[in-house]
Each structure stands twice: as structure tokens, then as C-alpha cells.
Amino acid sequence: MLDREGFRPNVGIVLLNQRNQVFWGKRIRTHSWQFPQGGIKYGETPEQAMYRELHEEVGLQPEHVRILARTRDWLRYEVPDHYIRREARGHYRGQKQIWFLLQLTGRDNDMNLRACDHPEFDAWRWNEYWVPLEVVIDFKRDVYQMALTELARFLPRANHHNRYLRSGMRAHRREDEERSNGEAPMEAADGETTPEGPR
């Protein structure tokens, strides 16, 4: 389900290795790369959704990672109309996301892109922390900027510097309405078709 403003509740995952490089996944059968992300199901907390998506998309279990931080508020992006499925136009606007910063405590070979029946990625690599800002699709860039900047202060000291900070970038950011209003997390509802596929 969507919230009252037409945004789908979602989680995003920034997964670090011991060199503070980030996991970057290639969407299956495309040339598009992105961070792991996915919808929050009815009754799930953002943390529960994060662990589920981490296993479905990357094949990792909770014991393979350590949570370093999460964004305080929802970060939102609107999806351009031509990427929205026709039947969802008029009520679906985009995604609102809580982002998690995780550190891999296991090994690279603990990852398995085919841990579920419908894999999201068919390849992956480690990237320097700020590189995704240069290559992510335009309408997600502001949210990536805000998430990476907010989470950067929780990086282990070895890589604690904000290269490539940009001025004038904006993303939709709101207080956590569901927490403040006492509402339960909402059912995830696909409405978006991006170059990476439905998310």
C-alpha cells in the first residue's frame, strides 16, 4: 500500500566491506547498477524489512552484518511519470525510504545473489563510498546524496571524509509519520517501472 501522499514505504541498504567500499549490484538482465532496496511489507518494521531484503537480494543473514546506523527520517523521491505503470498513474508518486548502513562481518563468499527464486542482481562489485552518486539514475540521486551524507559520519575512521559533497541537492524528507502517528508499517505496493525494472 501507499501512504496518504502516494509514496511506497521502502528500505535502502548501504553495505560496507572492511575498506569502507560499498556493495553495488547490477540489476538482472540490465546494465543498471544500484544499492539493494525493497518494500516494507504490512506489519514489518524497517529493520525487519532490511534483513529480509538483505537475504533476498544479497544472500546474507543477520549474523553476517553489523548495523552501524540508519537514517533518522524518511527520504523520498518522486518517479517521473513515464517510469510509472499506467494503472498506477495518478495515485503513485514514488518511494519513501529508511536507509541502513551495514558492515559486512562475514566474507565475500557468504553472499549469494540467487538466495531466492526471483533474484534482483546478476553481478556485483565493491565501489568507493561516493561513486554511486556519479552513476545512479537521475531521479534517485538526491536521495542517494542525502543518505550517504547522513550515514557518512558513522563510517569507521579510516574513510571518514566527505568527498564529492554537492551543494543545492534536495530530496523529499519528512519526519517518520507512521512512528509519530502511531500507525503500523504499510503494505508495500509496486507501482514503479524504472530502467532497472519494477521496484
Swiss-Prot record:
It is an enzyme of class 3 (hydrolase). Residues 166-199 are annotated as: Disordered. It comes from the Bacteria. It holds the Pfam family NUDIX. Residues 6-149 form the Nudix hydrolase domain. One of its GO terms (molecular function) is pyrophosphatase activity. Keywords: Hydrolase. InterPro entries: Nudix_hydrolase, NUDIX_hydrolase-like_dom_sf, NUDIX_hydrolase_CS, NUDIX_hydrolase_dom, RppH. Its EC number is 3.6.1.-. Its cofactor is a divalent metal cation. A motif (Nudix box) lies at residues 38-59. Gene3D superfamilies: Nucleoside Triphosphate Pyrophosphohydrolase. Belongs to the Nudix hydrolase family. RppH subfamily. Accelerates the degradation of transcripts by removing pyrophosphate from the 5'-end of triphosphorylated RNA, leading to a more labile monophosphorylated state that can stimulate subsequent ribonuclease cleavage. This is RNA pyrophosphohydrolase.
